[in-house]
Amino acid sequence: MRQAAYHWTDDQLHATLLDYHLLQKAWNMSDSKATIPLKRFLLLERCPTAWKEMDLYVFRDESVVFYVGQSHFAFARVWEHLIGGFHGHSIIGRFVWCNWPKSMKFTIELLSSQSEEFGVVGNELSASECLLIQRWSPCFNISQNNQPILLPDSYLPPNVPFRRRRSLNMLIHEAERAVQAEDAQLWLKNMEV
């Protein structure tokens, strides 16, 4: 076993991990799209400036799209779903919390209807949302979706009782611990190289 050459204070380690975290977020961002794991999204208290123009959002895992939506401020709308799901007012939000902690690995994508990708529909917001729904056939989009993909058996449906009912703050704290552990593991892996 290799012995550490440096002894880090908690503040130094936190600052280094924060720098790494910010770089990692930058890798998943462009002017018209941001992709971020749900557990990291939950730690954002404010919308990054570059994301304020994004008006489409996607809840997904590595192989299935669960939901596509539109809003003039997609970041805030994703938060509304998450908070509403905790209180039973959003089906996609409830699905996230019914599948906690597995859902920490879900991905949130924020997109701009003004990007080249949506030029084929004149960059119109509703038409851009419809294009994404037709492309991916999300599990929970019923409108404009002739054949929604069936929810994979590995996930609980949103109508089951919460298995781990806690306060929203406790769940966010769990996400924070998971991010810290992941960042520390990545940092150590990079130190070995």
Over which residues does each language-model region extend?
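Boundary/linker segments flanking structured domains
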Residues: 1-54, 60-66, 70-193
